[in-house]
Structures are given as C-alpha cells and as structure tokens.
C-alpha cells in the first residue's frame, strides 16, 4: 500500500519507515519544512533529549530541566538566525559542548545543578561516531507533519530499549502535530 501511494503521489506520500541493519531508522528532530519552532516543537525536542538523558525511573531535577530548556532554546535561536548552520543532533551536541558550556559558566551555574559533562557523556552514543549516531542525524530533509500516509514498522526494534522509546516519541510528536496543525484536513 505504501509503495502504491508513494508511486501515485510521485514520492510525496506513502512513507514507510523501518529499521534494518544496513538501512537504520534515521530522523532529524531539529528539521522543519518551515524552519519555525513553535512551543510544541520545542517541547517535543526537550522531551526527546530528556528521554535519551535520563532513565525511566530517574526524574530530572528542576535545575536540569531549566538547563536543558535553555540549551534547546539557545540552539534553536542559533539555527533560525543563521540558515548556514545545518540543524541536527550533532550540531546540538557540539553547541552544548562548546557554546552552551561557556554560557552556563558565565551564569555561574553550579555543576551540582547541571552536570554538563555527564549530560554530554550520556548523549555521546547519539553523536557522530557513536553506536546510535544515525538515529537523530538524518540528512533527509523530511518533515512528516505534511505527509498524508506514513507507516512505522516497529517489529525489528520492539526489544531495543534505546531505539523503541525514541521512535515512539517521534511517532507521537508526528501524530500530535498533525492533529493540531493541519486544520480542516481529515485525519485517520
């Protein structure tokens, strides 16, 4: 069905997303067709990064939530002000490692309030060269919000404690964005 829709829409719709060793699932949470980041998009990015950073049974402290929010907002400001910067997780990681580190040092944020080195260490597997560097650094400029038919095949990752929660969050974000943004369009 996906192939049929994909062919009939000349590649515009009928998106089939699955995980295979030689063709793993890849997204870019920092990409939007419009280049705009509303509150909902910002919150979904924060939730995604928080899921990567903290275990299910490990609640973030308020100071950590504030620091993460500051990092995401500052990075989004950077990529929206400078269109030459390619938005992706690698760029976010480098921004936190270099620029945001300086910003929180200037603000005198204590390490016990936000351990930036621990944060970067936990996120390193998703950064360039890490085990999951493919997952959040897709070079395809694909915003799923405007796609009319998408199939996510999860069988191959159903037992993966790293991939499944991330892919599930991206599916949820896509669904919620479609429900809220696409006014007057029938959704099924």
Label every PLM stretch briefly.
Residues 1-13, 17-188:
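P-loop NTPase motor domains
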